[in-house]
Amino acid sequence: MRRSEVLADESITCLQKALTHLREIWELIGIPEEQRLQRTEVVKKHIKDLLDRMIAEEESLRERLLKSISICQKELSTLCSELQVKPFQEEKDTTILQLEKDLRTQVELMRKQKKERKQELKLLQEQEQELRDILCMPPCDVDSTSVPTLEELKLFRQRVATLRETKESRREEFVNIKKQIILCMEELEHSPDTSFERDVVCEDESAFCLSLENIATLQKLLKQLEMKKSQNEAECEGLRTQIRELWDRLQIPEEEREPVEAIMTGSKTKIRNALKLEVDRLEELKMQNIKQVIEKIRVELAQFWDQCFYSQEQRQAFAPYYSEDYTENLLHLHDAEIVRLRNYYDVHKELFQGVQKWEESWKLFLEFERKASDPGRFTNRGGNLLKEEKERAKLQKTLPKLEEELKARIEQWEQEHSTAFVVNGQKFMEYVTEQWELHRLEKERAKQERQLKNKKQTEAEMLYGSTPRTPSKRPGQTPKKSGKMNTTTMSSATPNSSIRPVFGGSVYRSPMSRLPPSGSKSVVTSLCSGKKTPRAAQLRANKENLDLNGSILSGGYPGSTPLQHNCSIKSVASTYSEFSRELSKASRSDATSRILNSTNIQS
């Protein structure tokens, strides 16, 4: 049983006790029955009125709760629709009081969310409007009466963040451009003369409208100032170049140049004006010394002609170069020509430098070719032969590669400019081919001259006998060394010893290596001793005919056999080659005209 029911039973019991007590009092007093009935009616009426009032109050409470539930349900439905959230789900089997409490709590929560969203929307709108005012952007139409959704608030926050980033980037760009504009104006000595320039330079940075149009105008203004500054710098640099050229042409001494050095840097207006005054002064001085100036220009013209590989016809095409009528008009013609040539060289500088590199490599190649045909190169003592051979091999690889690179670059240039690139009056590759052909013809001519010379020499030897050929003078011997040499060389004849023939002249044996007799140990001892004999010095010189990998260079003699301790007897390569050639020619001649006298010296 509920406690309320127990209390109700107790109330009934209490009422019964009270009525019983009243009847007892009335009985003791002696109140008649009619008055007792009246008094009981009064008690009943009081109790009934009290209970009726209590019931009415409770009924009113129930009505209020039901009304509140209805109101909360309607408001909650509206709030869910505005906030775009799911409708509130009421719990089943709940009392009116609990339902009203739940609905009222949910309504308060929804109201709070609505208020927060509208407050955030208002704050974001204010921030956006402020940023749009700074960026000079039109306002964004947003219904401030409606409740924004969470997604709308998220997009709004992102939009405001984007505007803030745009503002910061434009502000930074504006500050940087402003600094550059101020520097350019100071360099140009230019004061702001328009309202926009004054807004940029003089007004507060925060008051400047950071619109795209203003930023574009700023960039345009900066470009104009930079272009003007570049023009001033180029003009000043041109004036300085002109001054230096005039100094050199007029041979102005250093003590006169020093006062002008102060204006040789910078591009401000006062410096530019000072440079113009100096140029005017030098031009006037140039007209007073026109002949010397023209001669100086002609020297420069000749240098540019050489650098541009002008042919003789191209040089002669500039007729004023050969005129001796030194007038102002002639000077102007020379000035115009030197400017044209300088520009022409600057435009094609890379190609001309490449051709110059090829020319230098070609001259070096011809020098190596000349040295290769010189027999005296084998007598060097500094190891230059090996170094030259390495450089020559390297040059033989790099020269064709350089020609191919230049050919590709020149072909590309000719396609771009629709004209031929000429060197000394002809196309570069034709020029290269001509140089190679001239080199081949020169080698052929030298070969024919050698053959003719050898033929004449052979005929002379057939008639008069051979003459000794000594490619290099043997160094003198000291008395001490000559004594030792006599003890060895006189005991046995060396293969290279010369013998006087019967008919006059000298006849040489074939150079070869011969081991000494087993009993002649003194030969090996003298050749391989620690002391440097002239013969040993010649042996060391002949070792330079060998390459690092053991191969024989041109003119070398591969047939020698090394003795003990690498001591060998070699003849000079050019002497042996001439000897073998003469011997082979003599063997084919008539027997009567090729008698070779020989005398054997017994050891």
Swiss-Prot record:
Domain statement: Microtubule binding occurs via a basic patch in the central spectrin-like domain and also requires the unstructured C-terminal domain.
Positions carrying Phosphothreonine: 470, 575, 599
The protein's name: Protein regulator of cytokinesis 1
UniProt-annotated stretches for the region Disordered: 447-502, 583-603
Similarity comment: family membership: Belongs to the MAP65/ASE1 family.
Source organism: Mus musculus (Mouse)
Sequence ranges of Polar residues compositional bias: 484-499, 589-603
Residue segments, region Dimerization: 1-341
Species classification: Eukaryota, Metazoa, Chordata, Craniata, Vertebrata
Biased composition (Basic and acidic residues): 447-459
